[in-house]
């Protein structure tokens, strides 16, 4: 990346993080100092070294859901992909009092430790899901630091799916976790959905400042659980990456949206079949790979999947979706690197700047642009790729520096 473009990225990132009135030069000096003290990264993520995450879910204090084992999960990952893979440890049923909501309890900490002990023994790289569903009382940041000090296989922490229950403790706590991850060379990966949600997150001073300090430790990623706003979510996350908020972006492909569409067979008319649990396990395997293509084509480097009994394995047996869609496309991304940030910046012909209002205030903006049904994320990247959405905190000079020659659209554009 040339010096002018690099400076524009830094300026944009600092603009987003600059809630306090601190001079740009001082912020740049502080960031440079923090960067020089960062630990060696535990996982390398880039367009030439993407990351494939595969999830296992907690069942009892010492077991996993769906008959899986940690050893079996790692064995299911092909040897040529293992250097680019890690296992997501999701506590799921271990969470009390509500499944999948990781409130800090002795049982939760014991499960984390049990799984980390096993991962260390078997030398399996893992990420801990420590935030989800708006839970405020998660494990303390310093507890996470202790695990980094104890377990070399711990690669980072994850925050997953809070869009339906936002509260301002989420970004405040996430900032603390991001700082710990940066201290130990880990990644903090945050999967979530909808433009408004990410706007709220970046309006939180603690998180915006942490993101500005530690962009290389932060992965911002989509999570397309509901049947709405896939294109605008891709746009805002892509725009955050292009303006330097995070060094990598990605997605969690969620077949739950198939359930929300009432589908139980490929392309059955909506509503013709019962809305039951068969739905999430019947999204066509190839469509999962198509979703990966959208991420890849727009510079994404982190691939994750919900509904793991369908997208990864059960009873220690890899699923057809994993073997026939996810693995083949991930191999393709290894052999044919996704476009770099420099590549995406250079090819971008237009951006949407939220100076005059958010893109979500324009009903049906995307309808007919890249898709005819925004409830399914198969057409988010059209002929002109994803349209980056730039937060209003980034000034016009920074945008022009990043995207020379690109049209800058706003809500009031003719």
Identify what each model region corresponds to.
Residues 1-16:
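N-terminal secretory signal peptides and thylakoid transit peptides that target proteins
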């Amino acid at each position: 990346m040339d010096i002018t473009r690099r400076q524009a990225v830094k300026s944009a990132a600092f603009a987003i993080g600059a809630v306090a009135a601190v001079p740009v030069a001082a912020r740049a000096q502080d960031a440079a100092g923090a960067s020089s003290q960062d630990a060696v990264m535990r996982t390398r993520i880039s367009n030439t070294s993407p990351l494939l995450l595969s999830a296992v879910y907690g069942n009892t204090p010492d077991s996993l859901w769906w008959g899986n084992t940690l050893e079996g999960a790692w064995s299911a990952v092909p040897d040529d992909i293992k250097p680019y893979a890690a296992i997501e440890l999701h506590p799921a049923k271990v969470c009390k009092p509500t499944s999948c909501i990781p409130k800090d309890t002795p049982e939760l900490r014991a499960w984390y430790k049990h799984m980390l002990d096993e991962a260390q023994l078997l030398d399996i790289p893992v990420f801990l899901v420590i935030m989800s569903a708006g839970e405020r009382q998660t494990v303390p940041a310093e507890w996470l630091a202790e695990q980094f000090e104890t377990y070399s296989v711990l690669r980072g922490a994850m925050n997953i799916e809070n869009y339906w229950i936002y509260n301002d403790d989420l970004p405040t706590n996430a900032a603390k976790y991001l700082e710990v991850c940066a201290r130990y060379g880990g990644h903090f990966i945050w999967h979530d959905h909808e433009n408004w949600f990410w706007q709220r997150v970046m309006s939180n001073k603690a998180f915006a400042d942490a993101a500005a300090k530690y962009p290389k430790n932060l992965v911002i990623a989509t999570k397309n659980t509901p049947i709405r706003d896939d294109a605008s979510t891709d746009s805002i996350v892509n725009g955050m990456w292009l303006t330097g908020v995070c060094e990598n972006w990605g997605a969690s492909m969620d077949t739950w949206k198939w359930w929300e569409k009432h589908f139980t067979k490929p392309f059955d008319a909506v509503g013709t079949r019962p809305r039951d649990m068969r739905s999430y396990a019947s999204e066509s395997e190839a469509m999962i790979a198509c979703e990966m293509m959208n991420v890849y084509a727009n510079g994404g480097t982190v691939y994750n999947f919900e509904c793991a009994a369908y997208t990864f394995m059960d009873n220690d047996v890899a699923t057809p979706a994993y073997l026939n869609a996810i693995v083949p496309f991930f191999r393709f991304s290894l052999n044919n690197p996704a476009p770099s940030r420099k590549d995406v910046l250079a090819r971008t012909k237009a951006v949407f700047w939220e100076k005059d209002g958010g893109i979500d205030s324009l009903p049906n903006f995307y309808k007919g642009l890249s898709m005819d049904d925004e409830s399914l994320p198969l057409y988010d990247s059209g002929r002109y790729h994803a349209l980056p959405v730039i937060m209003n905190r980034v000034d016009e000079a920074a945008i022009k520096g990043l995207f020379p020659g690109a049209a800058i659209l706003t809500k009031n554009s003719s």
